[in-house]
Amino acid sequence: MARLAAFDMDGTLLMPDHHLGEKTLSTLARLRERDITLTFATGRHALEMQHILGALSLDAYLITGNGTRVHSLEGELLHRDDLPADVAELVLYQQWDTRASMHIFNDDGWFTGKEIPALLQAFVYSGFRYQIIDVKKMPLGSVTKICFCGDHDDLTRLQIQLYEALGERAHLCFSATDCLEVLPVGCNKGAALTVLTQHLGLSLRDCMAFGDAMNDREMLGCVGSGFIMGNAMPQLRAELPHLPVIGHCRNQAVSHYLTHWLDYPHLPYSPE
């Protein structure tokens, strides 16, 4: 029996309308009744996730910013990882050949240079939103991550530019087809989950995890039981071909799988 369950949010636990379904909430409560530790592992900000947990009265550990922060049930900071100031400076000040919008994160929130109302649709559940700033005046010593949002083909070309400029000084990953992230070296959900399990005295073999994008790759690959969403990025399936694929997030597939796991643990599972 797994002792910890780690969940990506967007494309995994959240439905396409960016809400948690009632079946999902019920299943999370059942896991807690079985003393299974809940962990939300997401690219979203800690401030937003703490608000969501409070609104839903959920007890869960948080891995946020794609591994840049880990918080306890009580909100205590257990782990932090920031971009080096010189890396943040290069990414913020360089003129990149891209149409993508740039977004900067630190402990105070989410910052960008202009209004992009369409991006806020993903945050209707929490009401979290960006702050408009002059990105050139952003303090460089406290940046957790920098994201670029736009067309996937454009972001793929940008990824090449970033690799050429940064080399091994940052970790680049797609958290969605339309979002490319610049993270500290060695920073990912899997590394953060390793820190958390050590804090809890658990083994990664004691964990299960669910995800749909390339920022979930390390986490899904390091746990005892990793599960890929039916709506996952093709690149993730190709990277982890040995992992089982469950259903689509629109059908609350995580809840569907876990209900079977809780009620019929010895029977084979079908996502249909």
From Swiss-Prot:
Keywords, in A-Z order: Hydrolase, Magnesium, Metal-binding
InterPro entries in the cross-refs: Cof, HAD-like_sf, HAD-SF_hydro_IIB, HAD_sf, HMP-PP_phosphatase
Obligatory cofactor(s): Mg(2+)
Gene3D superfamilies the UniProt entry points to: 3.30.1240.10, HAD superfamily/HAD-like
Catalytic function, reaction form: 4-amino-2-methyl-5-(diphosphooxymethyl)pyrimidine + H2O = 4-amino-2-methyl-5-(phosphooxymethyl)pyrimidine + phosphate + H(+)
Binding site for Mg(2+): D8, D10, D212
EC number: 3.6.1.-
Residues at the active site: D8 (nucleophile)
Keyword check for Metal-binding: yes
Keyword Metal-binding included in the entry's annotation: yes
GO molecular function, one term: phosphatase activity
Purpose: Catalyzes the hydrolysis of 4-amino-2-methyl-5-hydroxymethylpyrimidine pyrophosphate (HMP-PP) to 4-amino-2-methyl-5-hydroxymethylpyrimidine phosphate (HMP-P).
Family indicated by similarity: Belongs to the HAD-like hydrolase superfamily. Cof family.
Protein name as catalogued: HMP-PP phosphatase
Gene field: cof
